[in-house]
């Protein structure tokens, strides 16, 4: 896939989501765009494609299909004309929302939002491994109606990023939107071992994380902030707060939740999307702290 190709995914069934998107449902859920192509794509079994991950070497896409009843991961290959071909389809649980390849490109780590499970799927195995991390306290997985009333009544892991320490140990950071915390795991060959948690402010709702050297940037969906945390590598991995900064103007009083967070290729800028205010907050990274440059709609 060339650098100037974009694949856009869209929800096509709002009724089985754990949230309420704005707009209308689409008919064909995938759109491929580049300088020469505008192509709607459909793949057998593809519904509500919430997250797409490209293999860094192979012409393979991993697509997670989101549902409060049963999520799936599709493995899809493509040719030079971006014709998609389904290679595999596995069940993954309730509201699958995030995918991450490990550093060795041997396993796909999968996060479920509604039941808060994390699972590992070997890339060379047709039979996926069962959930490797279940919360000590039972997650009831409220129905859609009750969940929309209170998204923080129970645990909801939302994503996962891997971090390699100075001693070459693999660490996984998992933001839990429901409990306002960051889970910290040791990641060892098909296993996640809980080692610590970092508590955030109440009603933060941590969603996604971007990594820059020994710092992580967490976008908080519910209170529209970014928190900058330094990774402390002592006996047990911990986090230290460096900065909290808003993603919306001080005088804005309307509804807003944050979406994505990303650091650009130069590592000089960080961008956060706002949903409700319908804008992008752009920050300059200066010695790991953030300086707000603009909030553009």
Sequence positions of predicted segments:
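Conserved beta-strand positions in repeat-built beta-propeller and related beta-rich domains
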Residues: 8-19, 63-67, 110-113, 174-177, ...
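Beta-rich, blade/repeat-based domains predominating
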Residues: 16, 46-56, 92-103, 107, ...
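Short loop/turn segments immediately following beta-strands, especially the blade-tip
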Residues: 28-35, 75-82, 121-132, 186-191, ...
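A short beta-strand motif characteristic of beta-propeller blades
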Residues: 38-45, 85-90, 138, 143-151, ...
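Blade-loop segments of beta-propeller domains
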Residues: 38-105
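Loop-centered beta-sheet repeat module
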Residues: 171-226
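Loop/turn-rich, solvent-exposed surfaces of beta-rich toroidal or solenoidal domains
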Residues: 255-289, 293-297
């Amino acid at each position: 896939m060339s650098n100037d190709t974009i694949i856009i995914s869209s929800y096509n069934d709002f009724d089985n989501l754990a949230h309420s998107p704005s707009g209308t449902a689409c008919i064909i859920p995938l759109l491929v765009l580049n300088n020469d192509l505008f192509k709607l794509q459909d793949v057998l079994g593809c519904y509500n494609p919430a997250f797409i991950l490209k293999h860094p070497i192979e012409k393979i896409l991993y697509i997670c299909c989101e549902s409060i009843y049963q999520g799936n991961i599709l493995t899809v290959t493509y040719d030079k004309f971006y014709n998609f071909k389904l290679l595999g389809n596995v069940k993954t649980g309730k509201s699958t929302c995030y995918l991450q390849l490990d550093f060795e490109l041997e396993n796909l780590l999968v996060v479920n939002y509604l039941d808060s499970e994390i699972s590992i799927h070997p890339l060379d195995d047709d039979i996926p491994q069962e959930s490797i991390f279940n919360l000590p306290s039972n997650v009831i997985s409220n129905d859609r109606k009750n969940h929309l009333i209170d998204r923080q009544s129970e645990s909801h892991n939302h994503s996962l990023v891997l971090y390699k320490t100075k001693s070459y140990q693999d660490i996984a950071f998992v933001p839990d939107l429901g409990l306002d915390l960051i889970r910290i795991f040791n990641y060892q060959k098909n296993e996640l071992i809980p080692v610590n948690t970092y508590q955030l402010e109440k009603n933060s709702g941590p969603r996604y994380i971007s990594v820059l050297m020994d710092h992580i940037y967490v976008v908080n969906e519910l209170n529209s902030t970014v928190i900058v945390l330094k990774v402390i590598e002592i006996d047990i991995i911990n986090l230290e707060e460096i900065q909290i900064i808003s993603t919306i103007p001080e005088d804005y009083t309307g509804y807003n939740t944050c979406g994505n967070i990303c650091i650009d290729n130069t590592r000089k800028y960080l961008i956060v999307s706002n949903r409700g205010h319908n804008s992008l907050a752009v920050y300059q990274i200066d010695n790991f702290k953030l300086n707000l440059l603009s909030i553009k709609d």
